[in-house]
């Protein structure tokens, strides 16, 4: 009986020591800090907003704290070019906003650019230019046409939001431009509103040079449509007035989906209609 108790005591002791040794590393191991508990460094705008909130600033005053990305048309174009360089170079920052920065935009938006682009799902305007919330006033429609609807949007951006550049951006492989190059009989088979879109594009692409390479010909057609839409936008009274005061620049752009790069059409020569 005594031998049995002794064996039992030894086994119990071994089990106790094993359990204790198993727990020991866990006690010594450092406990990782949860990611949510790590304080992120405050940005300059965060500090300004915190100070304003402590002082009891109104929402209107808080909205004014966001610094503009660009104050001139030239700065706006440079900001778009720099953002696109980051995008196609694989260095996109995809700017994120802190909660305070989002709150600062509740009552007011301050975009520095208005971009009229195609509704193609492969052409996300803010991503292409690596810009964040509130930086670009985006207007999208198939074939990036200038008509009363889109004009109303960019008029608002120019007159009330004081955007510094209006970009008309076409893109590689645009389906609307491709359809506008089809024979009239095929275009007539489309629904009414699709035909309306094609009617706004067809005049720009009917006299495209006889280029053998399909890709090169398509590029020329898209750029021809961009030139036409830029010309129409420049005739808009609100746009014309802002350009005359050097408050706005109107440029064209061609986005190459395959590379991610945007080529800008800025000079009179580049924007001249054929």
Range-by-range predicted roles:
Residues 168:
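Conserved functional hotspot residues or short segments at active or partner-binding sites
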Residues 1-4:
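Positively charged n-region of N-terminal signal peptides that target proteins for export
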Residues 117-122, 142-145, 171-174:
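Short glycine-enriched loops at secondary-structure junctions
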Residues 23-108, 134, 144-152, 156-161, ...:
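Divalent-metal-activated hydrolytic enzyme cores
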